Swiss-Prot record:
Subcellular location: Cytoplasm
Residues the record marks as active site: C188, D195
Gene coding for it: queF
Lineage: Bacteria, Pseudomonadati, Pseudomonadota, Gammaproteobacteria, Alteromonadales
Protein's UniProt name: NADPH-dependent 7-cyano-7-deazaguanine reductase
Protein's UniProt keywords contain NADP: yes
Pathway the protein contributes to: tRNA modification; tRNA-queuosine biosynthesis
Species, as recorded: Pseudoalteromonas translucida (strain TAC 125)
Length: 281
C-alpha cells in the first residue's frame, strides 16, 4: 500500500503543528490537499472517475460579529463534489472558520458569500453552503441507519492490516441489499488521531459474505488516511474484488474540532439519498 503521508504536497499542513488562533477573517488559512494523492495509490483515473458523490461537512462552531459588533452564530453545511481536484485539510478549515469570530459582517448572506468564494477557490469546484440559525438546525435528527447491521456477527479478528483480497462473495446469486456497521475506525494520515464512523453500504451484485465485509471494515482500525480517502478505498476495493453492478458507500464520521465529515460515493448518484445522522454525531 502506497504511503503518501510524507508527500511534498502535504508540507505546510497545520495538522500536528502548534498554531496561532486568528480571530480576524483570513481565507489564506485554508490548506488544500490534492485528491490525486490517494487516487493514484488506488489506480483511480481522475479524468474518468469510477464513481460520483460528495463530501458533506457540518460546521457547528461558526460565529461572527454583525455590523454593530453583536455576536452571531450559525450551523453550516458544506457540500463538496467528489469531482473537485482538492479537499480541504480539516484543521485548516477549523482555523479558517475561527477567523470569522471577531470580524464584522453586514449580514449572514455576506458571510455565506465569503464561505462559498473561499472554499470554491481552494478546491477548484463550486461548493454549496447552507447556514442555519441555532434553532433552525433540526433537519437531520438521529435516525436508525438503513439496512441490516453486521456488527453482531461472531467472528474472530487477528489482522488489522487492510487486505482487499479478504472480501469474498457469499454466493453467485444477485441481490440488492443495504448493510451498515458502526465499527469503522481509521486514523488521521498526519497525526494518527482516531477517526470514528458508521458506514452504509448499498449494492446490487453477487451477495457479499458479511463476515468478510466486517473483517475488512475492522481492518481499517490501524490505517492512517483522511475520511474521504478511506471511503474511496472501501468503494474501490468492493468494486475491484467483487462482482457488483451498483454500489453506494456512505460514512458518517463523528465530529472533531467542531466539524464532522460525511463522504458519499456511488456508481449512479451525485447526491446521497441517505438523510441520516448517527447518535454519535
Amino acid at each position: 500500500m502506497t504511503d503518501y503521508s510524507n508527500s511534498p504536497d502535504l508540507k505546510g499542513s497545520v495538522l500536528g503543528q502548534s498554531t496561532e488562533y486568528i480571530d480576524q477573517y483570513t481565507p489564506s488559512l485554508l490548506f488544500p490537499i490534492a485528491r490525486k494523492l490517494n487516487r493514484d495509490a488506488l489506480n483511480i483515473d481522475e479524468a474518468a472517475l469510477p464513481f460520483k458523490g460528495q463530501d458533506i461537512w457540518t460546521g457547528y462552531e461558526l460565529s461572527w460579529l454583525n455590523a454593530k459588533g453583536k455576536p452571531q452564530v450559525a450551523i453550516a453545511v458544506f457540500t463538496f463534489a467528489c469531482q473537485s481536484s482538492h479537499l480541504v485539510e480539516s484543521k485548516s478549515f477549523k482555523l479558517y472558520l475561527n477567523s470569522f469570530n471577531q470580524t464584522r459582517f453586514n449580514s449572514r448572506d455576506e458571510v455565506k458569500q465569503h464561505l462559498v468564494k473561499d472554499l470554491t477557490a481552494v478546491v477548484n469546484s463550486l461548493v454549496q453552503v447552507t447556514l442555519y440559525n441555532a434553532d433552525e438546525y433540526n433537519c437531520l435528527p438521529y435516525t436508525p441507519l438503513p439496512g441490516e447491521c453486521i456488527d453482531d456477527l461472531d467472528i474472530e479478528i487477528d489482522n488489522y492490516d487492510i487486505d482487499a483480497h479478504s472480501l469474498k462473495s457469499q454466493s453467485n446469486k444477485t441481490v440488492t441489499e443495504t448493510l451498515h456497521s458502526h465499527l469503522l475506525k481509521s486514523n488521521c494520515l498526519i497525526t494518527s488521531q482516531p477517526d470514528w464512523a458508521s458506514v452504509i453500504i448499498r449494492y446490487t451484485g453477487e451477495q457479499i459474505c458479511r463476515e468478510s465485509l466486517l473483517r475488512y471494515l475492522i481492518s481499517f482500525r490501524t490505517h492512517n488516511e483522511f475520511h474521504e480517502q478511506c471511503v474511496e478505498r472501501i468503494y474501490s476495493d468492493l468494486s475491484t474484488q467483487l462482482s457488483i453492478k451498483n454500489l453506494e458507500v456512505y460514512a458518517r464520521y463523528t465530529r472533531r474540532g467542531g466539524l464532522d465529515i460525511n463522504p458519499y460515493r456511488s456508481t449512479h448518484n451525485n447526491d446521497t439519498p441517505f438523510a441520516v445522522k448517527i447518535n454519535r454525531q
